[in-house]
């Protein structure tokens, strides 16, 4: 979990690649904790924090080249503060209450 929560997350992940290579440790998959989705102190699904991971496409490709599948942690809700919340609400894509409003409950970082 510490890798994607670090401010220099991408750099730490590449160090991980180097370390397993140096120690000849086999690795076919890596679970990315939700730090890669961070906006401020919040975790916002389907969002790459480009301060931590400036080039996510290259990052994913580099791991794939090494035979490592990245498995991203995806939270089961969009926070009401998520940048795409209003757009998704407008499209009617949320689970709804009986009155037609999006179902909202408490999650780790806020309501979603």
Identify what each model region corresponds to.
Residues 1-112:
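Aromatic-lined carbohydrate-binding/catalytic grooves of carbohydrate-active enzymes
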């Amino acid at each position: 979990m510490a890798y994607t929560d670090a401010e220099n997350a991408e750099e730490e992940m590449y160090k991980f690649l180097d370390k397993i290579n140096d120690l000849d440790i086999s690795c076919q998959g890596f679970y990315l904790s939700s730090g890669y989705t961070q906006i401020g102190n919040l975790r916002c699904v389907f969002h790459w924090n480009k301060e931590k991971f400036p080039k996510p496409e290259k990052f994913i490709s580099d791991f794939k080249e090494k035979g490592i599948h990245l498995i991203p942690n995806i939270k089961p809700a969009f926070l009401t503060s998520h940048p795409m919340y209003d757009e998704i609400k407008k499209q009617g894509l949320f689970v709804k209450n009986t009155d037609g409003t999006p179902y909202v409950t408490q999650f780790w970082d806020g309501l979603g």
